[in-house]
Amino acid sequence: EWLPQNRADVWEFQADHRFGEAMAEAKYFFMTHAEALLHGDLHTGSVMVRKPEGSNEADSVKVFDSEFAFYGPVAFDVGATWANYAIAAARAYALGEDDRAHWCLGLVGETWHAFEAEFRRRWPERRDPRLWDEEFLNRLLQRWRNESWLFAAAKMSRRIIGAAKTTDIETLPPEIREGAARGVLRMARSAVVERWADSTPNHFQELAEWLLVEARTS
């Protein structure tokens, strides 16, 4: 259950028809776009990274808890990860850890750019280069980037007022939890609109920083 102080935020959320339409689109993509084998419940707690002492590079990355794996839209896992960063940033802002919040949101861009670089590296291995050319690749990546905002919005809202709430927010003291929850909900609602104006990770970061800081309470 959400805090009584967030009741008005929930009512505004429920009355947001544009968000409802966007979630219908997200659910349709989820059910019909079998593009890749996905983790299905990806968040930072599902990833283990090993870095040798004295090195800045990881030599091993393991992802576990794959019981929800399925064939679905590529952007689903990407968006889920972005949402996790935003929620972690909301907690950090609520606790006054602004530098940590900025770092969390900076991971949105790092994650996307690493994904895009790896996908482009593997692109020469595609089955039919005559059909799927570089222009097709650019359009595909742009679509996935846009859809990542959509699935991030779905995940953010679900983690605040849905059945699978996040301890990042739930364990905050009520007086600061109120603003953190409000900020995440506002980011979710804004994301489904702002993705059409600018779907870059940098815009996601800037928008989240502004909304989360504006909403925080003390």
Q: Which residues fall in each region the model found?
A:
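Secondary-structure capping and boundary motifs in well-ordered enzyme cores
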Residues: 34, 39, 70, 74, ...
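An acidic intrinsically disordered interaction segment
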Residues: 34-39, 43-44, 116-131
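Acidic, serine/threonine- and proline-rich low-complexity regulatory regions
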Residues: 96, 100, 126-147
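ATP/Mg2+ or Mg2+-diphosphate-binding catalytic cores
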Residues: 135-218
